[in-house]
From Swiss-Prot:
Family the UniProt entry places it in: Belongs to the class I-like SAM-binding methyltransferase superfamily. TrmB family.
Role, per record: Catalyzes the formation of N(7)-methylguanine at position 46 (m7G46) in tRNA.
Protein name: tRNA (guanine-N(7)-)-methyltransferase
Gene3D superfamilies: Vaccinia Virus protein VP39
Phylogenetic lineage: Bacteria, Pseudomonadati, Myxococcota, Myxococcia, Myxococcales
GO CC terms of this entry: tRNA methyltransferase complex
Active site: 112
Pfam families cross-referenced by the UniProt entry: Methyltransf_4 (PF02390)
PROSITE patterns: SAM_MT_TRMB
Originating gene: trmB
Organism field: Myxococcus xanthus (strain DK1622)
Enzyme's top EC category: transferase
Keywords from the named record: Methyltransferase, S-adenosyl-L-methionine, Transferase, tRNA processing
InterPro entries: SAM-dependent_MTases_sf (IPR029063), tRNA_(Gua-N-7)_MeTrfase_Trmb (IPR003358), tRNA_methyltr_TrmB_bact (IPR055361)
Length: 206
């Protein structure tokens, strides 16, 4: 009788089990800006961003096993030592592993596959989590949000502004497309097809 095949450990398991922030300098082997991505998906944004910004220490959350493992594997093979992928729900881990005012930027990539109005209670950006993220971001830090669902984008923008994030373009205004920004795998499809993407680039006051 053959033995059952053991499943590999989740990517970034050591971070999932930590109760306090790790020594990020020791983890990455260098110091530099620390950035968080929630919802890295297929990894297009995280991988390209880390290629363009080798000075940044980038921590990406993705709860889908295939995407999380594939992204970390591709980063390792490409020699990107500045990317760590965590295969888990960011809402439960972020509160424990990042100190207050420690993040230079937060990237929120096309969250919430449950896009119907009746699914709003499942949305990642709720007031309590938005307030927590605000506390983790350093003064002057950037919150970069992108979604393809306009109603959800309007709601998230309102929540984020309500907890203190400032919109340089004015309250409730989405940010226009900037070709210098790094698109995600999903965003590239929308850019190619001409479908709209709703973006916001918010700041925490210095």
């Amino acid at each position: 009788m053959s033995r059952p095949r053991l499943l590999p450990e989740p990517v970034g398991l050591k971070f999932v089990t930590q109760e306090t922030p790790p020594d990020w300098d020791a983890e990455f082997g260098f110091s530099g800006p620390l950035e968080l991505e929630i919802g890295s998906g297929a990894g297009g944004h995280a991988l390209e961003y880390c290629r363009r910004h080798p000075e940044v220490r980038f921590v990406a959350f993705e709860w889908r096993k295939k995407y999380a493992r594939d992204t970390q594997d591709r980063a390792d093979k490409a020699g990107l030592r500045n990317l760590r992928v965590i295969e888990s729900d960011a809402r439960f881990i972020v509160p424990r592993i990042f100190a207050p005012d420690s993040l230079a930027a937060i990237h929120l990539q096309f969250p919430d596959p449950w896009w119907k109005r009746s699914h709003a209670k499942r949305a990642v950006i709720q007031p309590a989590f938005a307030e927590l993220l605000y506390g983790k971001l350093a003064p002057g830090g950037l919150f970069d949000m992108r979604t393809d669902v306009q109603d959800r984008g309007v709601t998230m923008l309102a929540i984020l502004e309500s907890v203190g994030f400032k919109n340089p373009l004015g309250s409730g205004v989405f940010h226009p497309y900037d070709p210098e920004e790094v698109p995600s795998t999903r965003e590239r499809r929308y850019l190619a097809s001409g479908e709209p993407v709703y973006r916001a680039r918010l700041l925490k006051p210095a």
